[in-house]
Amino acid sequence: MSKHERHNAIRELIAQRPIASQDELRRKLVRRGFDVTQATLSRDIHELRIYKGPGGYALPNGNGHDEQDDLPDVDEVMSSFGLKVKQAQNQLVLVTTAGSAQPVALAIDHEDWPEVVGTLAGDDTVLIICPDQKRATVLAERLEKIIG
């Protein structure tokens, strides 16, 4: 089946009922005849701008449209999913709960903070690149306050 068909199936499954994990979503896709790996599903989730909130995975605006007002709030996702921040010169490594790095990185990216050049999200880790060490320290302190 095509990528387009898989994306439609993902949207439909998430709209139908709460999905708590990527593995649960992957199993539901397999039952529908899609041969999908965790890596492919991770890319699909990123491309569809799906985020993981307290109730499970959700589509932006509930229908897959990309509208900034419907993105998760950085304070909400950081306090829910952020665990710790480690600084390495001008870079920060933000450790999150499993499966939560994508929505955290998305929320940080959309804050448009001058301390952030860009983010790179894995499954439970976000790499944040800052322009210099001083701004990395400022951002680390801000994120640690949000995490609590």
From Swiss-Prot:
The keyword Translocase does not apply. It is found in: Cytoplasm. It comes from the Bacteria. Pfam families: Arg_repressor (PF01316), Arg_repressor_C (PF02863). Pathway: Amino-acid biosynthesis; L-arginine biosynthesis [regulation]. GO terms for molecular function: arginine binding; DNA binding; DNA-binding transcription factor activity. The keyword Transcription regulation applies. Gene3D superfamilies: 3.30.1360.40, Winged helix-like DNA-binding domain superfamily/Winged helix DNA-binding domain. GO terms for biological process: L-arginine biosynthetic process; protein complex oligomerization; regulation of arginine biosynthetic process. Keywords: Amino-acid biosynthesis, Arginine biosynthesis, Cytoplasm, DNA-binding, Repressor, Transcription, Transcription regulation. Its main location: cytoplasm. One of its GO terms (cellular component) is cytoplasm. InterPro entries: Arg_repress, Arg_repress_C, Arg_repress_C_sf, Arg_repress_DNA-bd, WH-like_DNA-bd_sf, WH_DNA-bd_sf. Belongs to the ArgR family. Regulates arginine biosynthesis genes. This is Arginine repressor.
